[in-house]
UniProtKB/Swiss-Prot annotation:
GO terms under cellular component: cytoplasm; nucleus
Cell location: Cytoplasm; Nucleus
Full protein name: Zinc finger-containing ubiquitin peptidase 1
EC number annotated for this UniProt entry: 3.4.19.12
Entry function: Deubiquitinase with endodeubiquitinase activity that specifically interacts with and cleaves 'Lys-63'-linked long polyubiquitin chains. Shows only weak activity against 'Lys-11' and 'Lys-48'-linked chains. Plays an important role in genome stability pathways, functioning to prevent spontaneous DNA damage and also promote cellular survival in response to exogenous DNA damage. Modulates the ubiquitination status of replication protein A (RPA) complex proteins in response to replication stress.
Active site: 361 (nucleophile), 492 (proton acceptor), 513
Top-level lineage group: Eukaryota
Site residues, Involved in the stabilization of negative charge on the oxyanion by the formation of the oxyanion hole: 488
Subunit structure: Interacts with RPA1 and RPA2.
Protein family: Belongs to the peptidase C78 family. ZUFSP subfamily.
Species the sequence originates in: Bos taurus
Length: 579
């Protein structure tokens, strides 16, 4: 269809348009349909309409084509042409409106028209200027058009999400498919209304509401799915971090446990670093390297040690004898602050050597106790032909007692092996060894303090009752026939050889410590013994503050039947507890 630029009439073909122009406009007087301009030919009228009234003339004729440009349906070349014409028309129309003089009713001719020469001369110049300016703006228009087309997206239905090609199709879709939603509910009517529980939209149909809510749920499920994926990833990461932390913790615990185990092995001499012989040789070599021992002395001592180990008898190089006799003389002639003192039977002091330094206190205390028993005729039957054994021999004797069936729990703890190790021994091993020799003894466990500040006054009272059967009427110095007492606490052991009672009734133990070297003990052998020399022997109540103490006290000789009974009882080892 073709439309006449002058009157707007539409014809079906180009020949019809030519006939229309000839008959209607060229043969008759041409009059502007907008401003009544007349007296011009056809070409001039077309130019006038194109420049002065293009917007009014094209508004209805190009409405559809302009919409097509806005929705991006036409090709780029046609869109650019139409957009350019629309811009030109708008600008020319505004230019005409601003530049042409206002025409009042009095200035118009009686027939209501304007002559060509009155109008043409005023607007022709402005029209030509505008056409030149539009040529410069055409390139900008094309750029704007491409940007607009790039940013455009097809319209989407707000109810169901369907996408249409243009706004007219979308409007048709909404009117046909969602007409119920477009109706405004009437007041005071009985029509049921359905509110969306999520966004508050009012629907007149339950099925429409259901579709609308389904859209909400789809969006929500998508978001929840994303959240679930994220949560799953977070949970997986948290589990990995927890597993890594647990692995590191277990590894650290295993490392610390191994270090503690190795420390205990070294502490108790079970680290396979050798026993008495190896340590003796190693320490003597160190002394030679430091210049403290001559090589000839090293070889002499090594030979003596090998001989001692071969016969199983202590070489006596760490022994100090005669101390008990020296103590008796001292208390008889001095010690004015002492009310009464009880001394054990004769006993030799043994101290640690290069071979057992740091772990041999239990063995040295046994040597002290055995040295006293060997001087007592009451134990000759049990200790017939025995001498004070060396430390490796004592280890062998304890292993033999385990083999007889004594203290299986203790044997298991030490892997049934003492020889060739630096394993410590305590009250249980001393009891086991003495019982296997048919020496009657008892273990008393002072498992907790019985006095203020962690002291053990009950321990002192028990030792006093052991040595002093009758305190009143006895002389100041009492030399008893009782053997010394083995005294054990955590990490160390000593031998109790007597007890003092001060004039203020306080008690003080006299103990031999295997950690005290011979040169210090020999100071007690002097006739003019000083009080300061006794300081290393005296232990008051306030000096013994360990949490637990155990003592092994000898009480006589066992018969063969009693030995068997005690061996059976040692299967589950128990001790007398005080308190």
């Amino acid at each position: 269809m073709l439309s006449c630029d002058i009157c707007g009439e539409t014809v079906s073909s180009e020949p019809d348009m030519k006939a229309h122009l000839l008959i209607v406009h060229m043969e008759n007087e041409v009059i502007c349909p907008f401003c009544k301009l007349s007296g011009v030919n056809y070409d001039e009228m077309c130019f006038h309409i194109e420049t002065a009234h293009f917007e009014q003339n094209e508004l209805e004729r190009n409405f559809e084509r302009i919409n097509t440009v806005q929705y991006g349906i036409s090709d780029n070349r046609k869109d650019s042409s139409l957009q350019c014409r629309a811009d030109i028309n708008s600008s020319v129309h505004s230019a005409c409106a601003s530049n042409q003089p206002k025409i009042s009713a009095q200035s118009l001719p009686k027939d209501g028209t304007l002559k060509h020469k009155d109008f043409y001369s005023e607007n022709l110049t402005e029209s030509r200027k505008f056409l030149k300016s539009t040529e410069k703006q055409s390139d900008r228009t094309k750029i704007k058009e491409s940007i607009y087309e790039t940013m455009y997206s097809p319209p989407e239905c707000p109810f169901c999400g369907k996408i249409e090609d243009n706004s007219q199709d979308m409007e048709t879709h909404v009117k046909t498919k969602h007409a119920d939603l477009l109706d405004t509910p009437l007041e005071d009517c009985n029509q049921l209304l359905y509110d969306c529980p999520m966004c508050g939209l009012v629907c007149t149909n339950y099925h429409i509401l259901q579709e609308h809510v389904d859209l909400h749920l789809e969006e929500s499920s998508f978001g929840q799915g994303v959240n679930r994926v994220q949560c799953s990833r977070d949970l997986e990461l948290a589990q990995q971090l927890q597993q890594e932390e647990d692995r590191k913790r277990r590894s650290e615990e295993s490392r610390q446990e191994m270090e503690e185990f190795q420390k205990l092995q070294r502490q108790y001499g079970l680290d396979n670093s050798g026993g008495y012989k190896q340590q003796q040789l190693r320490n003597m070599e160190i002394e030679v390297n430091r210049g403290r021992m001559h090589p000839s002395e090293f070889h002499r001592r090594k030979a003596d040690m090998m001989e001692s180990l071969a016969i199983g008898v202590d070489d006596g190089k760490t022994k100090t004898s005669g101390i008990m006799e020296a103590l008796y003389r001292y208390y008889q002639n001095a010690a004015t602050d002492v009310r009464r003192v009880w001394l054990s039977a004769g006993v030799d002091h043994f101290h640690s050597s290069f071979g057992d330094k740091g772990w041999g206190c239990g063995y040295r205390n046994f040597q002290m106790l055995l040295s006293s028993l060997l001087q007592n005729d009451a134990y000759d039957d049990s200790l017939k032909g025995m001498s004070v054994p060396c430390i490796p021999k004592i280890q062998s004797m304890i292993e033999d007692a385990w083999k007889e069936g004594f203290d299986p729990q203790g044997a298991s703890q030490l892997n049934d092996k003492l020889q060739g190790t630096k394993a410590w021994i305590g009250a249980c091993e001393i009891y086991t060894l003495l019982t296997s020799l048919r020496i009657k003894c008892r273990i008393v466990d002072f498992h907790k303090s019985t006095g203020p500040l962690g002291t053990h006054p009950r321990l002192f009272e028990w030792i006093l009752s052991y040595y002093a059967s009758e305190r009143e009427g006895s002389p100041k110095v009492v030399c008893t026939s009782k053997p010394p007492i083995y005294l054990q606490h955590q990490g160390h052991s000593r031998t109790v050889v007597g007890i003092e009672e001060k004039k203020n009734r306080t008690l003080c133990l006299l103990v031999f410590d295997p950690g005290c070297p011979s040169r210090e003990m020999q100071k007690l052998l002097k006739h003019d013994m000083e009080v300061s020399s006794l300081k290393q022997l005296r232990k008051f109540v306030g000096n013994l503050k360990h949490k637990q103490y155990q003592i092994v006290a000898v009480e006589g000789v066992l018969s063969s039947e009693e030995k068997i009974a005690r061996r059976q009882a040692s299967q589950v080892f128990t001790a007398e507890k005080i308190p």
